[in-house]
Amino acid sequence: MSPLECSECFGDQLLHRTYTWQLTLHSRPNFTRKRDTRSESLEIPINVVLPQRGTAEPFPRLHNLHSIPRCAQQAALPRLSRRMASQHSYPLNRFSSVPLDPMERPMSQADLELDYNPPRVQLSDEMFVFQDGRWVNENCRLQSPYFSPSASFHHKLHHKRLAKEFVLQEENKSLREENKALREENRMLRKENKILQVFWEEHKASLGREESRPPSPLPQKDSASLEVVKKDHVALQVPRGKEDSTLQLLREENRALQQLLEQKQAYWTQTEDAAAPAEESKPAPSPHEEPCSPGLLQDQGSGLSSHFEEPRGPPAPQEDSKTLRALREMVSNMSGPSGEEEAKAGPGLPDGCQPLQLLREMRQALQALLKENRLLQEENRTLQVLRAEHRGFQEENKALWENNKLKLQQKLVIDTVTEVTARMEMLIEELYAFMPGRSQDPKKPSRV
């Protein structure tokens, strides 16, 4: 007998080594015939599978490697029945008990009446079965003619599938509950962020009011702004469009004021140029008489508003008239009662004092507008800071959610690994239970 290594029946993964012994059976010559004194021989290959790692015990196995009888006499040899073959095919000195019929296929699992489940391993979502010396996918495997699982095997497999489905449903349910809790936490954080924004705005508004108190207070405007701020705080909303609209209004007011100043300067230069030759031609007026220049308005009893209504200069367009009216109303509102008193006392003042008074009022209005503009810019900066903090909170929530998800996945992987190791140990114990008794217990294979 010469052992030959064979690795063709194991595919790509060499899990075992196969040794082949050539058994030669010699038949006695027939002495009844005097002439026929030849002896006949029959060669039968037997494969013995030895695992590479873990166990050192051989597993004799017969493969369908038998050749067709070479002659009629060889085919007419008596066949050994299966019942005469011993069930124990171990150790190697008992190969005579193995069925040596070359035309007979190896005994299947159903013939031996063994309830044996093949080894199974689950990787991710796929199940692999160890069949015919290799790991095969359970869904794509080919049914071997020597593999015939019993009804109990299918029953166990069905129960395992039901248990896996139940476990998956429980995991999905727990993940949904965790997702719901994270959403609630995110909603609460958003509410807290809004409340903090409101408190910050109130604090900034109070500080701005204390710093930007002009010498001429504006009680009406402050009360209106306070009411607007309170309404916004109750609603817990800080619309950005409103801020943009206020900034745009302030810019338009600044532009209108600049245009008004330019028009007044041009108007005053024209009046001065026209009044210079008139004063040279006319005698010096008495101190009780008021000089009447041709560029001034006829109706002097209307006070300061007369300069904004009907100037004798070139006719201004419709937009300039609208801006002038808006500026007149704004200056009158911001000047308050002092402006009304000055307007009442306006006709009694000389012409040189009226433009100075107007310049003072416009300067006060510009200062108030600049202070409001600064406050709005500071509020805009604080809003940007709060938005950045809100983004940071959102990123932290996202990181926490990802961490929890990774922890769940790690737990699932650990559970699956422990389950696979437990199943492998059970399978190894079953394999050793099917093997015959030995003098020494073999060592268990080391875990990979």
UniProtKB/Swiss-Prot annotation:
Keywords recorded for this protein, A-Z: Coiled coil, Phosphoprotein
Biased amino acid composition, Basic and acidic residues: 279-291
Tree of life domain: Eukaryota
Phosphoserine found at: 41, 86, 89, 97, 124, 144, 148, 150, 212, 225, 335, 338
Q: Where is this region: Disordered?
A: 206-226, 270-321
Coiled coil ranges (UniProt) are 163-198, 242-267, 356-414
CDD domains, alphabetized? Cby_like
Concerning its family, UniProt says: Belongs to the chibby family. SPERT subfamily.
Q: How does it assemble?
A: Homodimer. Binds to NEK1.
Q: What is this protein called?
A: Protein chibby homolog 2
Q: Which gene encodes it?
A: CBY2
